[in-house]
């Protein structure tokens, strides 16, 4: 069963098309790695799922509910971490999450639960402005996880972290579907992390979906075309390069 499906989903602006007729199939309970160069359309697609920008063509359903007919109900089922999360620096981590809890109408216990999931319980009283970058990323994840929504949309959750922080966040994300029966859509430029984290991947370039499937399916298809398959990064770069040449574009 797919918890998110798109049908020719498109987002066009006056001078370019950011997302061009893509058909995504995101399985329930999976970690879905969303890949592509800068400007490929990943963030735009995620923002459409969150109601932050409107599609100009096509449609999508989330948990069987069509957008925008069921917009409010859909958004209640999604936790998100888009770009660098903003916090009130003069409030503690706990107080920042309390604001989110009240907006969402969640029980008081949800704040403590979210802090525990991301490992910030012992730092909950510390002011957010005194958090390290890794702790801020964890707080952003806590904000997405609060209330344990069935769908998480995470845009570059390991951005700016050191190797230890990246490993910790990857391990956390990988554990979420099994622990909380949720689905994770995650984008990252760290292809080695997606290779370790994702069950299924989708690759975008210039708004077009080049591939969707498992890593084994990607390697099999790449090998048949003579592309390198030693690791995801080499395969990804070969696919993007071939597509750019086909379109007559250069990255």
Predicted features, each with a name:
Residues 58-69, 73-74:
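Conserved ABC transporter NBD signature motif
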Residues 98, 102, 108-124:
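Conserved ABC ATPase "signature" region
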Residues 167-180:
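Helical segment within the ABC ATPase nucleotide-binding domain
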Residues 152-156:
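Catalytic Walker B motif of ABC-type/P-loop ATPase nucleotide-binding domains
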């Amino acid at each position: 069963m797919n918890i998110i499906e798109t049908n020719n989903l498109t987002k066009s602006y006056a001078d370019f098309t950011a997302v061009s007729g893509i058909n995504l199939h995101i399985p329930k309970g999976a970690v879905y790695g969303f890949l592509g160069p800068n400007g490929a359309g990943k963030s735009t697609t995620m923002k459409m799922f969150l109601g932050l920008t409107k599609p100009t063509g096509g449609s999508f359903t989330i948990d069987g509910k069509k957008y925008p007919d069921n917009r409010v109900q859909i958004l209640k089922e999604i936790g998100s971490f888009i770009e660098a999360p903003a916090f009130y620096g003069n409030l503690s981590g706990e107080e920042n999450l309390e604001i989110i809890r009240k907006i969402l109408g969640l029980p008081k216990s949800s704040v403590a639960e979210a802090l525990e999931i991301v490992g910030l319980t012992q730092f909950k009283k510390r002011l957010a402005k005194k958090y390290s970058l890794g702790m801020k990323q964890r707080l952003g994840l806590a904000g997405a996880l609060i209330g344990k929504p069935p769908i998480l949309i995470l845009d570059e959750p390991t951005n700016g972290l050191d190797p230890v922080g990246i490993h910790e966040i990857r391990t956390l994300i990988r554990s979420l579907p099994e622990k909380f029966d949720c689905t994770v859509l995650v984008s990252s430029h760290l292809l080695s992390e997606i290779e370790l984290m994702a069950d299924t991947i989708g690759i975008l370039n210039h708004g077009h979906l080049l591939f969707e499937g498992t890593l084994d399916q990607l390697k099999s298809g790449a090998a048949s075309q003579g592309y390198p398959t030693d690791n995801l990064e080499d395969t990804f770069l070969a696919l993007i390069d071939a597509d750019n040449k086909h379109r007559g574009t250069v990255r």
